[in-house]
Amino acid sequence: GHVPCGKDGRKCGYHADCCNCCLSGICKPSTSWTGCSTSTFD
């Protein structure tokens, strides 16, 4: 599904769709950050 993500509340189907949004909903600059992923949101 899609969830609001990031400062601008964009809808994202994938974490990478909004600057690698992490599970916490915080955008990080790289998927190498702990908790970041390019997998789909459930």
Swiss-Prot record:
Compartments, record wording: Secreted
Disulfide bonds: 5-19, 12-22, 18-27, 21-36
PROSITE patterns xrefs: I_CONOTOXIN
Keyword Manganese on entry: no
One GO CC annotation: extracellular region
InterPro entries: Conotoxin-I_CS, Toxin_19
GO molecular function, one term: sodium channel regulator activity
Domain of life according to the entry: Eukaryota
Keywords for this protein: Disulfide bond, Ion channel impairing toxin, Neurotoxin, Secreted, Toxin, Voltage-gated sodium channel impairing toxin
A Pfam cross-reference name: Toxin_19
Tissue spec: Expressed by the venom duct.
Family: Belongs to the conotoxin I1 superfamily.
Domain notes: The cysteine framework is XI (C-C-CC-CC-C-C).
Function of the protein: Iota-conotoxins bind to voltage-gated sodium channels (Nav) and act as agonists by shifting the voltage-dependence of activation to more hyperpolarized levels. Produces general excitatory symptoms.
Record's protein name: Iota-conotoxin-like M11.5
Organism name: Conus magus (Magical cone)
